[in-house]
From Swiss-Prot:
Provenance organism: Saccharophagus degradans (strain 2-40 / ATCC 43961 / DSM 17024)
CDD domains with a match to the protein in the record: DHOD_2_like
Gene designation: pyrD
UniProt: substrate binding residues: 65, 110-114, 171, 176, 245-246
Active site: 174
A GO MF term: dihydroorotate dehydrogenase (quinone) activity
Record's protein name: Dihydroorotate dehydrogenase (quinone)
Length: 339
């Protein structure tokens, strides 16, 4: 059934079909019609960052930016759902068109630019949620905020979402917000992490609960840069690292009609690069921090490969678009069967 729906949606503009599919998903949930789409997912409970996850397969940020579809997505079998990226103020993002499919490569290029309705809208939606599972909230900075003031935006978001999140992800790796990836390096990263940790400590006291913070990094780094980022995160007592975001490389899709579109490339072409980053992180961290692996999972074996490389959890997004909810069960089964 999903293949038929996907083929119909793929005849439309990519962003139109994205919005339409979410609207349908929400409608099906309200009408209690999601069961045919949700397969039985093999339980593989694990505790990561102090949180109990029912299985290791989560939804990556970006699909539900505003928290409008948490209840529906939560019924599909995910072990956790991450929403966002959200910013303090609503923003429209980059001009359209800004989302492109590469079906031959099971890939997507996006230059959305953190389009979202603002953190207050997301919090209002999350407060109404019926989904009882693990919820991550991914936060970013507004485009109009100068790079040197980025910490202010992250703290504003943390202040608003802390009470409602099971974990918070700090997104410093999207290629679609000018200067954002500069936050990943050197003293800039160290100062940002120190400020985020200070905010986390303050909020933990205020709310009498500890909400872990993970940092999402880019795949386009050398081994030395990955080591440096990892050391900064460990020294800053960050709770986890998500590897990776989209890539700006086009090596794997050269010749495709959309290959030269600006933005981040996700899906199958980023699979191996993401897994290599996970392996590099794992070898360097030696268990000092859990890794959440994301990037290019289009079948169960891809998810298991990321676990084997050192990830404790995995997330899917582009593969979910191409394969549908069955990928959740396939990934969870592959991980569980590998032990």
């Amino acid at each position: 059934m999903y293949s038929f729906i996907r083929n119909c949606l793929f005849k439309l503009d990519a962003e139109v079909s994205h919005e339409l599919s979410l609207d349908w998903l929400g409608a099906f949930e309200r009408l209690h019609m999601l069961k045919p789409f949700a397969l039985k997912v093999t339980p593989s409970p694990i505790n990561v960052m102090g949180i109990d996850f029912p299985n290791r397969v989560g939804l990556a940020a970006g699909l539900d930016k505003n928290g409008d579809f948490v209840n529906a997505l939560g019924q599909l079998g995910f072990g956790f759902v991450e929403i966002g990226t959200i910013t303090p103020l609503a923003q429209s993002g980059n001009p359209k068109p800004r989302l492109f499919r590469l079906p031959e490569h099971q890939a997507i290029i996006n230059r959305m630019g953190f389009n979202n309705k603002g953190v207050d809208h997301l919090v209002a939606q999350v407060q109404k949620r019926r989904y009882p599972g693990v919820l991550g909230i991914n936060i970013g900075k507004n485009k109009i905020t100068p790079e040197e003031n980025a910490l202010d935006d992250y703290v504003k978001c943390m202040d608003k979402v802390y009470a409602h999140a099971d974990y918070i992800t700090v997104n410093i790796s999207s290629p679609n917000t000018p200067g954002l990836r500069n936050l990943q390096f050197g003293e800039t990263l160290a100062n940002l992490i120190a400020g985020i940790k200070q905010a986390q400590d303050r909020l933990a006291q205020t709310h009498d609960k500890y909400v872990p913070v993970a940092v999402k990094i880019a795949p386009d780094m050398t081994a030395e840069e990955i080591h440096s980022v990892a050391d900064t995160l460990v020294n800053g007592n960050i709770d986890g690292v998500i590897a990776t975001n989209t890539t700006i490389s086009r090596e794997a899709v050269q010749g495709h009609i959309n290959a030269d579109e600006a933005g981040g490339l996700s899906g199958l072409p980023v699979r191996d690069k993401s897994t290599e980053v996970i392996a590099t992180l794992s070898a360097h961290l030696q268990g000092a921090m859990p890794i959440i692996g994301v990037g290019g999972i289009v079948e169960g074996a891809d998810a298991q490969a990321k676990i084997a490389a050192g990830a404790s959890l995995v997330q899917i997004y582009s593969g979910f678009i191409y394969k549908g909810p069955k990928l959740i069960a396939e990934a969870a089964d592959a991980i569980a069967s590998a032990g």
